[in-house]
Amino acid sequence: MSPAVAAPDMDDIMAAEARLAGLALRTPLVRLNYPDTPAEIYLKLENLQPVGSFKIRSMGNILRSADPQKLRSGVYTASSGNSGYALAWLAQRMGIPATVYVPENAPAGKRALISHTGAQIKALPYADWWDVICNHSASGEQGLYIDAVCDPAAIAGNATIGLEILHDLPQVDTIVVPFGGGGVSCGIAAAVGLLKPGTRVLAAECEMSTPFTSARAAGQAVAVENRKSFISGIGASTVLPEMWPLVKRLLSGSVVSPLNAIADAIRILFECNRVVAEGAGATALAGALTVQASGPVVCVITGGNIDKAHMMAILRGGVPVAA
């Protein structure tokens, strides 16, 4: 098993902020324009990044801190969409080849985004794709594997979101973050823990797969059922063992939402704030609408790369079928 992942310190986070200058946007923090909320809710709009998600921070910091010689033969990753698109987008601009391994049921819209960069896409059965993530490598690949979850540079890049939240809303009480592998939630929690201890960071999960909630209940990483839905980007088979000590220490708890509540959150974001969010990103708002807090709550809207057909179905009041 790989060694446990360590949290970034303030030097790591500040270095990441400097590397990302001119690449990642300093995204706005806006008040949710919805009256029926248990607390003041604010939206951190990472869906406005050039690649449509926060992944430009993690992938950007990894690539900008990597040895250029190691990048010459190309880069590859395993992703359900957003990490792969961010890597492919960055690789195109750096003039290096990129390959993205996706699960066979990856959303068509996200595959199209990756393809438009010129990157190679390799679709695998879910179990084989998950093996690439767990092993941090793929058989036969000659390039550098880029890990958007466990790489310390990825977590430090994600931590810059926490810096921005505290700068814009120092009185924040709770931050709700979608939980995929734990890289973004732990990055934000690391920054917040250094600057404003006591601020809660909650993992937002969908009822279809609850790796963090289940691990927290069991006291260790456990395998969970991963039922398919229209949501991609969160809901893994387990918390990666090397991430478990970090997520256990940094995250205050979790909130689990049903599919219909997440579809409702997508609709609320669009109708009330004209924000386009994908299912994973809207999971933060779905969770926040049930959270009791003593002060303002921030939802990190991690991405907006939603399939058009899914968005149309939701705006008509439905819940899309699985991809």
PLM ranges: what are they?
Residues 1-323:
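PLP-dependent amino-acid enzyme catalytic core
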